[in-house]
Amino acid sequence: MSQYSFTSESVSEGHPDKIADQISDAILDSILAQDPRARVACETYVKTGIVIMGGEITTTAWVNMEEIARNTIRDIGYVHSDMGFDANSCVILSVINKQSSDIQYSIDHGNTSTLQRGAGDQGLMFGYATNETSVFMPAPITYAHRLIKRKSQVRKSGVLPWLGLDAKSQVTVAYEHGKIIGITAVVLSIQHACDIKLTDLKEAAMEEIIKPVLPNKWLTNNTIFLINPGGRFVIGGPISDCGLTGRKIIVDTYGGIGRHGGGSFSGKDPSKVDRSAAYGARYVAKNIVAAGLADRCELQVSYAIGVPHPISMSIETFGTEKISHDILMQLIKNFFDFRPYGLIAMLDLLRPIYKETAVYGHFGRECFPWEKIDKADLLRDAAGLKCTP
């Protein structure tokens, strides 16, 4: 298919599912700050006036989970009862147990070497990278995130103070022979104050959010802009919809272009391969593309509970590889450690860095260690390629 289009979406920090993700990761960070070896699996549910946190946590740390949840909600901006969700008055319930001793034993099972500890569960994870953007991410999800981040910036800075906290974006990108030829559609739905006219909202969103973010070279007279196509959007956030940790896994990753193994990230410490192996697979894919060994790369890795080494690993480069898959796989095995605690050591994951991941995507942002391209030169030299990508 020489011509095709692809659409991805993002959601704002005030979207109910993202509130839940941020609370879960805020709790994780607070625990890791005191106890880097803690085992954490924290899920959060939010609805009008209530937050419920549940999961399994084994740690020597003590944290005030209610205070963390309230501060997170407050930082997002839900601070008035007329919003239907208020950090100061919402009910917060916690149902937390310790991690199962069976799971703990299956991971540790008497190993004195940390690197030989097994995976905490079975599962499959994917990592993806492409050279179509400077951050080695697909363009649809990259610009969907940037629209939402820009929306947050203009609200917080007072440029558009009447914007609400809840919002969604959607960007459709057209391709020809695998190369971007334009943006065909942009959808932006933004919560707003009740006295704002839809015409004013559309004009402001176009001038202050869309135009500063989207490359002008990709916009044409045929590009469709749908700003609040449903009309009035005054009621939003948890009063409108319930939110749950891990329900925006495609927003969190590649917007649907790269495949997903099904496991969510937020609220999970890095001993969970759902999170750490997905980060590791992204690290590998990005370095392969940055090295010029392929234009696109997707890596799958799978694990069995209690087993330290991956059960399988496979690579897909969509016909863009510059060297064979056999050589690529050998390079991965030579330069990357996919044992669960090898990943933790390689990416320095036992740190409180996770709340920042809970909005605007886990990938394509240079502040995270799995986004480094520090092995690109090494891979290129080992592959015998002398040219730069």
Curated annotation (Swiss-Prot):
CDD domains: S-AdoMet_synt
Location within or outside the cell: Cytoplasm
Pathway per the UniProt entry: Amino-acid biosynthesis; S-adenosyl-L-methionine biosynthesis; S-adenosyl-L-methionine from L-methionine: step 1/1
Cofactor dependence: Mg(2+); K(+)
Cofactor remark: Binds 2 divalent ions per subunit.
SUPFAM superfamilies: S-adenosylmethionine synthetase (SSF55973)
Span list, region Flexible loop: 99-109
Pfam family, one: S-AdoMet_synt_N
Keywords: ATP-binding, Cytoplasm, Magnesium, Metal-binding, Nucleotide-binding, One-carbon metabolism, Potassium, Transferase
Residues that coordinate or bind K(+): 43
Residues bound to L-methionine: 56, 99, 241, 272
Gene Ontology cellular-component annotations: cytoplasm
Gene Ontology BP annotations: one-carbon metabolic process; S-adenosylmethionine biosynthetic process
Gene3D superfamilies, sorted: 3.30.300.10
Disulfide bridge map: none
Superkingdom of the source species: Bacteria
InterPro entries: ADOMET_SYNTHASE_CS (IPR022631), S-AdoMet_synt_C (IPR022630), S-AdoMet_synt_central (IPR022629), S-AdoMet_synt_N (IPR022628), S-AdoMet_synthetase (IPR002133), S-AdoMet_synthetase_sfam (IPR022636)
Family membership: Belongs to the AdoMet synthase family.
HAMAP family: S_AdoMet_synth1
Quaternary structure and interacting proteins, as annotated: Homotetramer; dimer of dimers.
Protein name: S-adenosylmethionine synthase
Organismal lineage: Bacteria, Pseudomonadati, Pseudomonadota, Gammaproteobacteria, Enterobacterales
